[in-house]
């Protein structure tokens, strides 16, 4: 099924980095995204998953959660009409997903960097409780901003609603008086000075420089 799904979420964050960095935040589950138009299609995917050994994790209370060989896997549709929830950037992110080579003969699809950040910003806005210090979504955002050298050029190249959303989200962050602390708490000791670099790049981005 690897070619039919896009891997998303915190489990993929290390795939976006190109500089030496500290440990990545441990994550308890793997999130995969599937493009579906109806619940009937989701039911068919469920049957396919069960045939491959996936078991519904009813105890978790999460309707899209499965387990296989002890690994927790959340299987999420792009549309919010199927399970009642979704991220607004899932559909365009799925459409523009990129290939990532894990091994020579194994390739998976992941979000492009700009859509990864958009989904994380959207998730933080919805469930971050307005505190970047304790948000795993915000931690992932900082990790990519700190460890991907081309990220700001990639963000500047975005257009339309995506660009507007990114600019608006970063503007809101810059207007928060705790932004320096929020970023600092997710940086390694040796990287503490980079909080100023990240904030500076954020400001240049929203100002269109």
Model-based region annotation:
Residues 1-209:
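Compositionally biased terminal segments of proteins
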């Amino acid at each position: 099924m690897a070619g039919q799904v896009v891997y998303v979420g915190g489990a993929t964050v290390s795939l976006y980095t190109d500089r030496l960095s500290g440990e990545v935040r441990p994550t308890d589950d793997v999130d995969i995204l599937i493009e579906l138009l109806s619940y009937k299609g989701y039911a068919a995917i469920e049957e396919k998953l069960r045939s491959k050994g996936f078991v519904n994790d009813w105890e978790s209370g999460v309707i899209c959660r499965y387990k296989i060989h002890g690994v927790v896997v959340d299987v999420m549709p792009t549309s919010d009409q199927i399970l009642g929830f979704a991220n607004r950037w899932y559909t365009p992110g799925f459409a523009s997903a990129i290939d990532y080579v894990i091994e020579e003969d194994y390739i998976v699809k992941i979000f492009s960097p700009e859509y990864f950040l958009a989904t994380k910003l959207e998730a933080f806005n919805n469930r971050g409780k307005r505190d970047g210090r304790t948000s795993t979504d915000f931690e992932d955002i900082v990790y990519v901003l700190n460890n991907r050298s081309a990220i700001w050029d990639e963000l500047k190249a975005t257009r339309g609603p995506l660009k507007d959303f990114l600019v608006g989200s970063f503007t809101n962050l810059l207007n928060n008086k705790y932004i320096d602390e929020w970023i600092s708490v997710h940086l390694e000791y040796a990287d503490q000075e980079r909080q100023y670099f990240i904030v500076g790049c954020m400001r240049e981005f929203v100002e269109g420089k």
